[in-house]
Curated annotation (Swiss-Prot):
MF (Gene Ontology): magnesium ion binding; phosphopyruvate hydratase activity
Cofactors: Mg(2+)
CDD domains to which the protein is assigned, alphabetical: enolase (cd03313)
Organism: Paenarthrobacter aurescens (strain TC1)
Residues engaged in binding (2R)-2-phosphoglycerate: Q163, K335, R364, S365, K386
Protein name: Enolase
Family to which the UniProt record says this protein belongs: Belongs to the enolase family.
Amino acid sequence: MALIDAIHAREILDSRGNPTVEVEVLLSDGQIGRAAVPSGASTGEHEAVELRDGDKGRYLGKGVQKAVDAVIDEISPALIGFDATDQRSIDQAMIDLDGTPNKGKLGANAILGVSLAVANAAAASADLPLYKYLGGPNAHVLPVPLMNILNGGSHADSDVDIQEFMIAPIGAETFSEGLRWGVEVYHNLKAVLQEKGLSTGLGDEGGFAPNLPSNRAALDLIQEAIKNAGYTPGTDIALALDVASSEFYKEGAYQFEGKALSATEMSAYYAELVADYPLVSIEDPLDENDWEGWKTLTDTIGDKVQLVGDDLFVTNPVRLQQGIETATANSLLVKVNQIGSLTETLDAVSLAQRSGYTTITSHRSGETEDTTIADIAVATNAGQIKTGAPARSERVAKYNQLLRIEEELDDAARYAGRSAFPRFKG
């Protein structure tokens, strides 16, 4: 039995140049686990609290020294001597120590950093890769990468409302093949943009961020790039969206493409998109508090396309249960820092999968070189992962880890492919 001997934390930088928390956990057998915490740009109002210092004279108020101090001064003394394999008790001890419903005292960034570092240390102590430690012998499904190759919304400085336009290589036989297809489309998209005199500047997640006249124009450009790369839209490579609609929901209406639209009008818009394009997934199509609109949308097109709750569910089992009971949405986006501990994340995934919801393991727009989510995706047989474009090392790090996992699994590896999207009829 390996016990927790010491816990240390520090401030490091994320991919946007903002501070974040990194934690190291030392076990009694000498093994060390390390984890760094991501940060979102478009955050749901129901997410656990990311503790920032607020000192405008240091990192423009975005320092995380308070969270670092919480790890060193409060969490560490409370966890010394715990069995590192008892993840649930460790996470619960931190939740109890915090004592708030949203981890607002210690900070979800402090608690999550320790939670993930403990798991990494325990896996090292067991001489197992993290995905096998967490998922056991059944952890063998490689996820379809939802690759964000064109950015709009709060991830880019452009007139495109939808935040992410993604490609999903559903027709590939293996993860490595699917990744290659995605990379080839990404480079072909750059060539298409250059040919049309459009910007090839990058957004937060490595996707291109051109100024386009409409959201449909973005989908048309991506389909052109897919064809130029030698693939067939809908058969080889499908499309997916993250609308992040809470970002443009103002005063009871969706401020979309220059108009103020109702939930019913937005639903009609999405129904047209699903009819016109090979869309397998639409994330956050409506506001995080618009449960009535979400229910209507699910009833309208939920049998044809994956409808993903990100801001709606914030990886929270309580909010997810509300969705399940009302048959609202049909997929859960899984972001470890939304709920703030590994145990609660795995509980949410388990609840979703038992209830017939698909799951997508996801990064945040502010990322680090930490690859824990790649292992979580395989450990939970999620079938899908969102970790940005095949560019920028903080995104590519996760893809490279999945390549290593696929190689290690060898003949046992199975690529989720088209089966990850059971509602897609294209």
